[in-house]
Amino acid sequence: YHPYIDSYMDSIRGGEIESSKEIKQAMNYIEFKLNNPDVVIKVNMIDKAVELIERYFKITLYDWELLVIALIHCYYKSTDMVVFNKFLIMMGRGNGKNGFISAIAWYLTTHYHGVQEYNIDIVANSEKQAKTSFNDVYKMLERTWNKSKRFFYKTKEEITNLKTQSYIR
């Protein structure tokens, strides 16, 4: 399918990554969906997403994050609709969930994702928790503001991509 998908599926199925039966079932479901001849995987978009996220957020993405990014870019040729429209990320502390949400939220607002007005409201169990990811994006923009100011408008409440009119709040 794509190296990020294949590698993760092989690691789960081969036992290299410890996983639950539900994760193994998810691999079967992903394979079932991707075997549809109407599915296209947009490799260039995957590569660009990974490049931008790792460069701007100064991180190296985990294998599970690479899998999710790849699955985000699977579409039906006939409708250009996404194959996977919901993702549940449920894991213990310290596996990069907040950092990933920050980076992927930012990427999804860019013209590289290609969707106008792709708006993101970050929701969590508490306002403090929800602000963590928002603040990660805000700080990244602050750090790169000489370049980012051409593409984003930011306040402490909302970040707007000027080209796509997408926001994060």
Spans of features found by a protein language model:
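Phosphate/NTP-binding elements of NTP-utilizing enzymes
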Residues: 1-169
